[in-house]
Amino acid sequence: MKKTPSRLFPTYEVGSLPKLPARTSALEGREVADDEMQQLKRLGLKYGVDSAGAEEVIARLQKEKRKPASEERKQLLDFNALLNLRIQEKSGIDFVYDGEARRSEMYRHVVQQVEGFEDLPEMIRSQEEQSYRKSVCVAEPKLKLGALSVLVEEEFAFAENNALHKVKVPLNDPYMIAVMSDNRHYTRIARKQFPEDVWKQEYQAKREFTLALAKDIIRPQVEAVVALGASWIQLDLPCATVNVEHLPIVVEGVNAVVEGIPASFSLHFCYPRRNSLTKKNGYELLYPHVLHLDQRVRHFSLELANADDYESDLAVFAQYNTERKFDLGIGVIDITLGRHREGLYEKPQLVRERILRAAEVLKDPSLVYVAPDCGLRQLKLDRCIRLYEIMVEGAELARRG
């Protein structure tokens, strides 16, 4: 029996945690530094995760100067995943996952398992220190044989079987993959359909690409985890407002993923700083489009601690609550690298104030969930742990009033 979540202001993680350095070094065939091994042992002991197996694998790999075989790799990933679960649970987080311990990177993790994609040689800088290798869609995308096991089945089964708290599964959104890829295949088709209209070419190509990804790449992953027992699935939409003219495509893509599936869905949005000509800004950009989301989409996870105007951004959702209510996971922890480099942390009291302000603006405390702004993979693990603790402490203070 998994722990029952808090009834007021439940907490959750958004998705990623940084990979354990010892695990990463071992997987890549590099020497594991003494401080990396000490961290592995220290965290294993602190969070009650037996590190003996992982230590034995690493010692053997170091002695033989090689990369791990399949079973050795699995041992290291299992240890990292279980450690991430226990870190979240012992920090007091209500809904947990494995910190995406088995995923190399949110984009590459998926496209490497898709036929119809070819890699570009250069790395693309996305934001701050993050970069990724872009792929080109050259044919209709289809999952490779065995892809579901690699992408989600093994990962979810391990998390579900080992988690002591309720599980929320983060997955990619199809539009995100479409934006981050070179859309050569569908652009070629659209140019033939609309030879004189560049805007229609771009729109139709993006729409067809997104829907193909939704139906043939993302939806099968959702169906797989639901078949294994998943009840709450989060789709990550960091690129949702890159082009506000494409918001109908975003909504159509999400609906193609979730339609008819017996689960509850949430969407994670990064803060929508305006990238197209419009009088709207912030989360106002999402409306009225999100009103047309499938009814299975009941929850939004929002980057807010790093937003332009905390109350104004929340007021948008209150304004539309008469038409459709969404539960809101409010970002109360700013995870930007600038704060990380300066060693800055929110105070639990500030987290409390943000939560209570959200409850006041929305006029319904039951709509408010509590989360970091985004996934934490770009930070140091010790900092992530402290941020979780601050978030949970602030939520408890808010429950007291």
Indicate residue ranges for each PLM-predicted region.
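Domain-level signal for soluble alpha/beta catalytic cores
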Residues: 1-401
